Amino acid sequence: MSVARITTVNFNTKEDCDTMVENYVANAVSEFPEAKQLLQVRTSDTSVVAISLYADNEAMERASAARDKRLGASHHQHESLDTKTGEVKLNHSSNN
C-alpha cells in the first residue's frame, strides 16, 4: 500500500501564500518525480495543504531533500508548518 505525506502550511501573508502556490504548481512535478500523486489545496487566503502519495516509505524519504529545500527557502514566510505521514487506506478517483 502507498504512503502519504500531508503538510499544512500557514503563511504570514496572502501574498506569501500566493507566491508559494504559483511556484508549487509550476515546479512540484519536476521536483518530486517519484510522487504517484500530488495535490495542493488552498484552504484559506494564507493556508495550504499539500498531499503527496508515494509507492512506499523509501520513495517518500528520497523526496525529503527536495522537500527540505523547498520549505527551507520559504521558511521566513511560514507562520506555522505541520506534517503528518501515514499509510494510504483508500485512494479512489472517479472519471465523473
Regions found by a protein language model. Name each.
Residues 1-69, 76-96:
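Short S/T/G/P-rich N-terminal loop/turn motif that feeds into the first structured element of a domain
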